Amino acid sequence: MAIEPPGTPHENTGKQLVLQKIYVKDISFESPRTPDIFSKNIAPQTQLNIKSSSKEIAPDLHEVILTLTVEAKDKDQTLFLVELQQAGVFLIRGYKTEECRALVGSYCPGSLYPFAREAVATVVSKGGFPQLLLQPINFDTLYAQALKQQASDDDSVDGQSLAGTFGEPH
């Protein structure tokens, strides 16, 4: 059996998933305490918030945006704040609605995350701080948790109920 590259239509199914474009939609770096903090011995605490959203931009074309907010603090003082929207355009064809939602909610953000990690590490280093290595994330688990949370919050799903949370259309 030959291994098909991603995006190759599966025999008899017509299913296709192709990453067409990856880009930074928005990025911001703030370091309000520089250069004073460079001369201090600090032990920063870093917090990562992550969110995914999507929209259909044409039939079978989905823009997926992975938003990361990384804040490093020492006690109550912000050392740096990074806000990043890493985006991609995905062709998703031949999948059932639920399958498409799962792809957009977990597979697509997972494909974007390595690029987002690199962008965050680069901007933090260029800001004069030690490289920040964000740990891998299981996006299947995050998506499942978001669905579970939605089900417990509201039993009536209108298709937009997860707007603003992980992996759903906005």
Residue spans for each PLM region:
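N-terminal intrinsically disordered, cationic/polar leader segments
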Residues: A2-S111, F115-H170
